[in-house]
Amino acid sequence: MSKGARIKRAVVFTVSAAFAATMLTGCSQGGGDSAAGGDVTLEFAQWWEPELSDGALRGLMDDFEAANPGITVDLLSGPYASTKEQLFAGAAAGTMSDVVGLDGAWISDFAKQGALADLGPLLSDAGFDESQLSSTVVVDGETAMVPVVNFVYPLFTNDALLSEAGVSAPPSTRSEFESAAKAITALGDNTSGWVLPLSSDAPNGIQNDVMSWVWASGGSMLDDGKPDLTNDAVTSAVDYIAQLDADGVIAPGAATMKEQDKVEEFTNGRVGMMIDSLSHIATIRESNPDLTFSISAIPAEDGFSGERGIPFASWGIGVSASSEHPAEAAKLVSFLMSADTNSELSTLANAFPGNTASTPDFSDSDPLYQEAFDIYSAGYPANEFVGLPVAEQLMRDFDEQLQAALNGDQSVDEALEKSQEAWLGEF
């Protein structure tokens, strides 16, 4: 992510050219077909339909078909894991569905296979203005994926624990967070200020719980798409986390803790603060109806006044390079990214829109969703792992060195230098 991009509301995530493959020509044909008379059937493979209310996505497809006579959409829906397997098999065989739901972590692999079409010219030809998009994933100058809706990771705070510790409001700066974490931990009874999952089996804590401190102050772990882990922004954030660990305010067991463990610790009232996905709000409410909690932006460095980055995960979308019907596929992408449809889809998903002109209606939802949308609107979506080569391994490499630093086996500077070397090897 370039610094220029971070200043704007629209954020472009770029991937190193070394891992961007030239789009293949002469691919075998994708799943859509044409009937006599020129009618077109588009296959749309995704995991979204099962995660929405019954008939919600089909209803949007019906609206699209009504507005585009001659185009029919065949939804190929399944759980996330099976959709991933299906898409990777289709990419390898050149039979990927016309339109595909995407996770940003898959993009590097698909790009190396030349499996995704460049959405830039396709959307332009469809009459869609890319400047409306809150973010895009760009591989070697080509738009490989557009995030349709985003699920953000703000700071969750236990209202009762903060109040008991004498903290009047969720912390907004690093110094306020450290003070709050110390005050909560001082309550005793096995209570900790913050929870940090660092299990190497599921190393996404590096993305969501560590690098989020960098992004919250407008920093970056990349320079022109390449690793830059020894810069001041990353060093400052990791030094800060190391200080929190030295203060004894991080919940025990961080080295083996996974995201679900983190959520359980917070839900059971054993920690005062955590960084987590909005998707867990309903689960927390159901598991502990008596727990009162708030959400807020991740604290920034003291004195920082710019836009704050907030971690996110997306339902992304792309078009197969092997589709027989790229123009029609682009129409479907344009429809989903249009202001009105994107507002409706983000409302249905309790997520945030990928179109900057869209506004979800959370009037019938948990009020925290509206608060989260206000946080999201005031900052920018930040996840520099999207599209990187072997993103999970990069997190694991960093995790290993960070744990060694927290254990006192090396300094933070040494941990970052070794992580930088490991990442350069992967790139």
Regions from the language model: what does each represent?
Residues 354, 371-422:
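C-terminal capping/gating helix-and-loop segments adjacent to ligand/active sites or protein-protein/ligand interfaces
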Residues 144-148, 153, 178-227:
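Extracytoplasmic/periplasmic solute-binding protein
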Residues 117-131, 193-204, 216-236, 285-288, ...:
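Short, solvent-exposed loop/beta-turn-alpha elements that line the ligand-binding surface or hinge
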